[in-house]
């Protein structure tokens, strides 16, 4: 009686382990990614379920009156300011080409998120564990 039970439990463990590895080798997006992270991690940073919206019930604004929202948050000064001229490059403006190159450098330096690593491409268990606050034993 114990041999069939141990055989069944061994087969179940092998199937569970192989399905987890198979999920980790493929791409993981949305709910699958959350499920696998909850299996791998004791704690991780879950996706916040609420959407960006108008201010909540604690504000005095009426969500059904869009003009009230615009009037409340519209800037007082609607004038267009002249861009700052550069002293080093008289023909160019600050905020032009030099700042756009800095923006490209900032974007390329940013660490890839879990979506870029595991949803757009396939990732392994080691990559998934990097996103855990506390790894499950």
From Swiss-Prot:
The keyword Cell membrane does not apply. Residues 1-26 form the signal peptide. Pfam families: Insulin (PF00049). It is found in: Secreted. It comes from the Eukaryota. PROSITE patterns: INSULIN (PS00262). GO terms for molecular function: growth factor activity; hormone activity; insulin receptor binding; receptor ligand activity. The keyword Phosphoprotein does not apply. Broadly expressed at a low level in the embryonic mesoderm, beginning at stage 12. Expressed at a high level in the embryonic anterior midgut, with expression diminishing at late stage 16. Expressed at a low level in larval imaginal disks. Expressed at a high level in larval salivary glands and in seven cells of each larval brain hemisphere that may correspond to neurosecretory cells. GO terms for cellular component: extracellular region; extracellular space. Keywords: Cleavage on pair of basic residues, Disulfide bond, Growth factor, Growth regulation, Secreted, Signal. Disulfide bonds join 29-119, 41-132, 118-123. Residues 53-104 form a propeptide. Of the insulin-like peptides, Ilp2 is the closest homolog of human insulin. Possible ligand of InR/insulin-like receptor. Plays a role in regulating body size by increasing cell size and cell number of individual organs. Probably mediates its growth effects by acting as a ligand for the insulin receptor and transducing a signal via the Chico/PI3K/Akt(PKB) pathway. This is Insulin-like peptide 2. It comes from Drosophila melanogaster (Fruit fly). The gene is Ilp2.
């Amino acid at each position: 009686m114990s041999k069939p039970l141990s055989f069944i439990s061994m087969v179940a463990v092998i199937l569970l382990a192989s399905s987890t590895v198979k999920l980790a080798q493929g791409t993981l997006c949305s709910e699958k990614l959350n499920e696998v992270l909850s299996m791998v991690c004791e704690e991780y940073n879950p996706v916040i379920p609420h959407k960006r919206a108008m201010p909540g019930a604690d504000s005095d604004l009426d969500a059904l009156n869009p003009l009230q929202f615009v009037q409340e948050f519209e800037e007082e000064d609607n004038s267009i300011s002249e861009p700052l001229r550069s002293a080093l490059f008289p023909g160019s403006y600050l905020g032009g080409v030099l700042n756009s190159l800095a923006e490209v450098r900032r974007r390329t330096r940013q660490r890839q998120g879990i979506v870029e690593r595991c949803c757009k491409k396939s990732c392994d268990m080691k990559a998934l564990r990097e996103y855990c606050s506390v790894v499950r034993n």
